């Protein structure tokens, strides 16, 4: 159970970070392939970075809360 909790926390965090980076790459590719080139990707990237910072802080909060819940269950069992 201890290993599973650690593994699920790690995989959840990895999946969210990886998904954000993949969407960033797709946005850059979409923006630079258009008529405006790199200028067309600038505004969507700024918006996506702000959204990514919000999601990152939310993920950190969820990670900390889940870790506290897992630890509380362990302390409660003894």
From Swiss-Prot:
Q: What SUPFAM superfamilies does the database record attribute to this sequence?
A: F1F0 ATP synthase subunit A
Organism, scientific name: Alkalihalobacillus alcalophilus (Bacillus alcalophilus)
Q: Where are the transmembrane segments?
A: 13-33, 35-55, 57-77
Question: What processes does the entry annotate via GO biological process terms?
Answer: proton motive force-driven plasma membrane ATP synthesis
Q: What is its main location?
A: membrane
- GO MF annotations in UniProt: proton-transporting ATP synthase activity, rotational mechanism
Q: Which family does it belong to?
A: Belongs to the ATPase A chain family.
Q: How does it assemble?
A: F-type ATPases have 2 components, CF(1) - the catalytic core - and CF(0) - the membrane proton channel. CF(1) has five subunits: alpha(3), beta(3), gamma(1), delta(1), epsilon(1). CF(0) has three main subunits: a(1), b(2) and c(9-12). The alpha and beta chains form an alternating ring which encloses part of the gamma chain. CF(1) is attached to CF(0) by a central stalk formed by the gamma and epsilon chains, while a peripheral stalk is formed by the delta and b chains.
InterPro entries named in the record: ATP_syn_F0_a_bact/chloroplast, ATP_synth_F0_asu, ATP_synth_F0_asu_AS, F0_ATP_A_sf
Write the record's keywords in alphabetical order, separated by commas.
ATP synthesis, Cell membrane, CF(0), Hydrogen ion transport, Ion transport, Membrane, Transmembrane, Transmembrane helix, Transport
List the PANTHER family hit by this protein, alphabetically.
ATP SYNTHASE SUBUNIT A, CHLOROPLASTIC
Q: Where in the cell is it found?
A: Cell membrane
Q: Record's Gene Ontology CC terms?
A: plasma membrane; proton-transporting ATP synthase complex
What does it do? Key component of the proton channel; it plays a direct role in the translocation of protons across the membrane.
Q: What is this protein called?
A: ATP synthase subunit a
Designated gene of the protein = atpB
Under Pfam families, the record lists:
ATP-synt_A
Coiled coil keyword on record:
no
What is the protein's membrane topology class?
Answer: Multi-pass membrane protein
């Amino acid at each position: 159970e201890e290993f599973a909790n650690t593994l699920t926390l790690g995989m959840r965090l990895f999946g969210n970070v990886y998904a954000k980076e993949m969407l960033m790459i797709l946005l850059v590719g979409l923006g630079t392939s258009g008529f405006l080139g790199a200028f067309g990707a600038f505004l969507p990237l700024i918006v996506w970075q702000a959204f990514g910072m919000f999601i990152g802080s939310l993920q950190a909060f969820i990670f900390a809360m889940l870790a506290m819940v897992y630890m509380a269950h362990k302390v409660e069992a003894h």
